[in-house]
Amino acid sequence: MNTEVKKLINPGRTYVMYYIAKFCFTILTCMETYYIASYTTDAALIPVVLVFIPLTIPTIVDFIMSFLNGIILEKMPHPLGKYTFWMAIGPIVASICYAIVYIRFDDDKTCAIIMCAMIIIAHFFWNIAEITHTSVPSIMTDEVKQRSTLSMLQSSGSSVATFVFGLVALPIINAVNEKTGTLTQGYFALTVICGVLYIIGYLLLAFTIRGMEKREEELVAAAAARKAAEAHNEKAAKLSGKEMLQSFFGNGPLVALTLMQLFTWLCGFVPMGFTVYFFRCSLGAMAMMSLFVSGRSLAGMFAMFLFPVYQKLFKGNKKRMLLTCNLISIAWYFIFYFLRCNVMAYIVVSILVRLFAGPGAMNTLAFYADAATYAQWKTGADSRAFVMSLYTIPLKLALLIRGVLTSAILVALNYDPGLEPSTYKEPFFFVYVLLSGIFSLIAWLIMLFGYHLSEAKVTQMALEIQQRSTNSST
């Protein structure tokens, strides 16, 4: 039996291109994360009654499509390899459509509808392109250390991109707006710049993985031929809807990961929507917010340097690393809520917690890659791309829940910006700190009791899958 698992053909180059692609993609998505709402109301000056069209409808469509993107990736014909094809085409279409979002059309309703339509189209293409990116650790390598490294690079690339975007975005927007004498051209110019970077980053990665994808296509074709021969049915060579369902509902580790990620994203997204309220109303230190955000971004960047140290410390055990790191964060949420230390102490300790707890979450993508290997081993069908596409579902659902919770909480509080900020001190303290701790604790418990794939087991399954393919081709 072959004891060599599949590895990256050129690890060094793949690592660099994978990191660059994630960095460039995050740069573009930061436009939406930080500026789409303020652009709509303060720059495009779209009436409040129409704002829900571009801000809410795309989120709903995005969540629904998150269940279909993996199926589209699997079933849709493509002239090149499916990963190379979507990495090349997806960013181009997405960047063009997203740039149109920041063009101000004269009629308010027309502008809102066009924004909505372009966001939906852009999301469709960049979501599938992102699925191909998140699939790389699962598709291109079975070596658990390489998967962990790719997962770490994805997380680090996102953190660095967010930090860089925070430094350059507003100066570019203001400079272009001042030169053109408009409120919107700066947003459009910045989106074009981010889109070009996004296209370049993904094209570089597409060219890098093409050779590995060809190797994978040969292995998949051999396995499909074996399965079709065994079933005496050509249709058996394709991934069926039943096999897709089995890949999720029959995959305990994947179900646990999905639920864990949902509550992890809720822990991040829900307080993100209340950051301004928390600093203004609960802490009474609005001027300190930028220091807090920048400091945490920097901590996320430097956490990548602790990642290899943690790998050695935990002897490559991803689950133990994640649980230990998350326990640090959970403890800090509850300690701060009940002790109520001063603002500067909160900022400093939060930055340190982000630094020392950050490496744990950098393994998330590697967990999904392991669950994809488990699905292929258990069902015999190559459903890895489909499984990796499910990585985005908890994220989309968390965004949807955040929108509902944010509106519900503000309505329940009868929030009035004209009142004394301290009026809302306790409610926003609860939402930002204690609710985050509760979400994080639930995620921790799900991972502790629901996920049981060890690195040794994943390696053994990968070898068995490889042996099946070898046997089918002889």
Stretches with model-predicted labels:
Residues 2-474:
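Membrane-embedded alpha-helical bundles of multi-pass transporters/translocases
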